[in-house]
Amino acid sequence: TPDNNEIRKNMKKILLYALAIFLTGGMISSCSEDKLGDSIFDTNPPARTEFDNWLLRNYVKEYNIDFKYRLEDIEANMSYNHIPAEVEKSKKLAKIIKYLWLESYDEMFDKTGVNKDFMRTYAPKVILLIGSSAINPSSSTEILGSAEEGIKVVLYKVNSIDPTDVEMLNEYYFETMHHEFAHILHQKKSYPTEYNQISAADYSSTGWQNRTELQAWKLGFVTPYAGMQPQEDFVEVIANYLVKPDGFWENMLANAGTEGAAKIQTKFDMAKEWLMASWSIDIEELRTIIIRRSENIDSILNEKMTDNE
């Protein structure tokens, strides 16, 4: 009868609903009882070496600087073919940078009692070492170091250095580091705009590459690169005064001619006054400290990097 057919249809619907509820409940129960398996990725922090612990104490905690010696593609310019820095060379360079750059400023400020946290505050936050050199394809010039917006300094050709050759260290690294650090400082506190007018007619964004050192001196530049533009000129004066050996500055002035020597001396005097007025940096005292420390590098190279220093 029609009524019986209707009853059968309703019973089928009830059974289907009941079956669906049963199966769903079973699936939920099964899922709740399953345990997540171990990750296929290694989630354990990498083991720290004795060198890593030394960097943690002497760079991260002391100066808030991340000293990277392992090659990381996220940090490096991958348009170049890079080779990782050798660990032993990295250890020596880490000691030298701390002793010859960071601690030189510390020693100067300790004498005056001001700006004791200067390097912790203003030094670049990342120092990255690359074992190989980098060649600029557009100019075929070798890049020894570079900086990115005052945050990171990249030092190349680490595997080729002789840690005891101070002249090589200055050419490869410390001239670059003082150069880039001076950029950081003048970007925070501007130097006098009058400086830009001293050699205004002789700056050339590309022509500087064709000038010899002597030609640059006679135009009033301490290096050919200083003739690129005023800001580079300003920081080159500071960097070269700090790292060049005794006698270099006097020889440069003697060979620059009357006009060139006068321009270089005027630039130096302005840079010296600005460093003292803006940052309490006595550039002559700082240079004295750097030169003295340069003569004692051997004394720190063989120091052990122990965890109980």
Question: What role is predicted for each listed range?
Answer:
Residues 158-177:
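Short pre-active-site segment immediately N-terminal to the catalytic Zn-binding motif
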Residues 26-30:
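C-terminal motif of bacterial Sec signal peptides marking the signal peptidase cleavage site
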